[in-house]
Amino acid sequence: MADYLVKSLIDGGMFRAYVVDATETVAEAQQRHDTWSAATAALGRTLIGTMLLSTSLLKGDEKLTVKVNGHGPVGAIVVDGNANGTVKGYLQYPHTSLPLNEKHKIDVKKAVGVNGMLTVTKDQGLGQPYTGQVPLVSGELGEDFTYYLAKSEQIPSAVGVSVFVQPNNTVKVAGGFLIQVMPGASDEAIARLEQRIKEMPMVSELLLAGQTPEEILALLFKEEKIKIVQKMPVGFKCDCSKDRFAQSLASIQPAALQEMIDEDHGAEAVCHFCGTKYQFSEDDLRAILTEAQAK
């Protein structure tokens, strides 16, 4: 089934809740970057977290970039997201696999590391982008997104992100939730929610059991009134193109372009975000060089 995200209001606005099935999104990222298990889980969780952040914080054409660097074995993780729920992302070391942790699960904390920062840069089309940064408090990423929302956005929240990776490195399921506590929420309602989150299995386990985002919402808010505000398709989508890379090539020194023509007889550009390769022939490079010199 195609990935989708559900936005909802709980009890007339005590909470805003977002639940997403992002299985195909994370599976596509795994295939594009050939990630191994620990890298798949780390990148997947960051993709899901970014999707939840961008669909809850942004509107219109606004976009954001999440960077996670805990100086762990997977290196830096970079994910772009927008209000429409599409994401793209990559990490530094895709071929990272680690022994399972004491709970017999992928050791995301060790893969990501905790000696570093989570940085969110929001481009709201107002000129200078806004950047918020917090230290990594967990490395498991759900808690780190929660900490970011509390400290940088002043929104008390709960974030859960999880990915189930099969022994052959493919993604079986992936998903997550984000719950924002609104000013009208009672202490009793907050305590009840905290207890439910504590008792609830990971989202990936619920998806494995065939639960939908709507059913996961109902598990989180058993007694409360749920109003579904929007059900939106989400996915992995990259906006790279050969033209964009041609523009980048046009900005480098003419001598360097001439060298590519004379010595390499062409060039290959690879998109970090999606792995797509673009070939530029000698004629392509000559045309770019001629155009650049004419400016």
Swiss-Prot record:
PTM: Under oxidizing conditions two disulfide bonds are formed involving the reactive cysteines. Under reducing conditions zinc is bound to the reactive cysteines and the protein is inactive.
Localization in the cell: Cytoplasm
GO biological process, one term: protein refolding
Keywords for the protein's UniProt record, in alphabetical order: Chaperone, Cytoplasm, Disulfide bond, Redox-active center, Zinc
GO MF term list: protein folding chaperone; unfolded protein binding
Keyword Disulfide bond: yes
InterPro entries (alphabetical): Heat_shock_Hsp33 (IPR000397), Heat_shock_Hsp33_C (IPR016154), Heat_shock_Hsp33_N (IPR016153)
Superkingdom per UniProt: Bacteria
Family: Belongs to the HSP33 family.
Function: Redox regulated molecular chaperone. Protects both thermally unfolding and oxidatively damaged proteins from irreversible aggregation. Plays an important role in the bacterial defense system toward oxidative stress.
Entry protein name: 33 kDa chaperonin
The organism of origin for this protein: Levilactobacillus brevis (strain ATCC 367 / BCRC 12310 / CIP 105137 / JCM 1170 / LMG 11437 / NCIMB 947 / NCTC 947)
Upper classification of the organism: Bacteria, Bacillati, Bacillota, Bacilli, Lactobacillales
